[in-house]
């Protein structure tokens, strides 16, 4: 009998390393060390100055959609919810009209995320936002939000 058959070196080879169908997560690249999302101080300042439309656009800018950083996502959700609840009901339509189709989808994602964790009076306000966003984005916007893998 040969001496090589008693060896167990073959068990140390990772055969999955050579599989061409192996799943590789693209998100594994280095994430930035600083938290992503809108600048909370800037958004708060704009709200205090009464520039709600600029605060709205600033809050939706740089959303951590592709990030796995849950802290940044929750922080951004809180900022967006604060901006959405600051609007008066007659100003909502004007704000929604400033968004492109991707912005409408992003807004709908934040609306549905707000429905998941309701606060004091947020559901009524979010329903108003949902109504106005639905008029512009249509049913396709809802379907895209509910089937999207990129969460906020």
From Swiss-Prot:
Protein's UniProt keywords contain Acetylation: no
One Pfam assignment: P16-Arc
Comp. bias (Acidic residues): 27-43
MF term (GO), any: actin filament binding
S-S bridge residues: none
InterPro entries: ARPC5, ARPC5_sf
GO CC terms: Arp2/3 protein complex; cell projection; cytoplasm; nucleus; site of double-strand break
GO biological process: Arp2/3 complex-mediated actin nucleation; cell migration; regulation of actin filament polymerization
Record's keyword annotation contains rRNA processing: no
Keywords from the named record: Actin-binding, Cell projection, Cytoplasm, Cytoskeleton, Nucleus
Record family assignment: Belongs to the ARPC5 family.
Gene: arpc5-b
Region feature Disordered, mapped onto this chain: 21-44
UniProt-annotated location(s): Cytoplasm, Cytoskeleton; Cell projection; Nucleus
Subunit comment: Component of the Arp2/3 complex composed of actr2/arp2, actr3/arp3, arpc1 (arpc1a or arpc1b), arpc2, arpc3, arpc4 and arpc5.
PANTHER family tied to this protein: ARP2/3 COMPLEX 16 KD SUBUNIT P16-ARC
Name of this protein: Actin-related protein 2/3 complex subunit 5-B
Gene3D superfamilies xrefs: Actin-related protein 2/3 complex subunit 5 (1.25.40.190)
Organism, scientific name: Xenopus laevis (African clawed frog)
UniProt function note: Component of the Arp2/3 complex, a multiprotein complex that mediates actin polymerization upon stimulation by nucleation-promoting factor (NPF). The Arp2/3 complex mediates the formation of branched actin networks in the cytoplasm, providing the force for cell motility. In addition to its role in the cytoplasmic cytoskeleton, the Arp2/3 complex also promotes actin polymerization in the nucleus, thereby regulating gene transcription and repair of damaged DNA.
């Amino acid at each position: 009998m040969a001496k090589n058959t008693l060896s167990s070196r073959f068990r140390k080879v990772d055969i999955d390393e050579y599989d061409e169908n192996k799943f590789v997560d693209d998100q594994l690249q280095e994430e930035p060390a600083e938290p992503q999302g809108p600048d909370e101080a800037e958004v708060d300042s704009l709200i205090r100055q009464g520039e709600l439309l600029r605060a709205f656009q600033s809050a939706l800018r740089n959303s951590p959609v592709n990030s796995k950083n849950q802290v940044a996502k929750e922080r951004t959700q809180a900022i967006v919810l604060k901006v959405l609840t600051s609007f008066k009901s007659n100003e909502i339509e004007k704000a929604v009209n400033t968004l492109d189709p991707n912005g409408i989808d992003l807004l709908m994602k934040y609306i549905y995320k707000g429905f998941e964790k309701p606060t004091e009076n947020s559901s009524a306000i979010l329903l108003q936002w949902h109504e106005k966003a639905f008029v512009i984005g249509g049913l396709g916007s809802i379907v895209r939000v509910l089937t999207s893998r990129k969460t906020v």
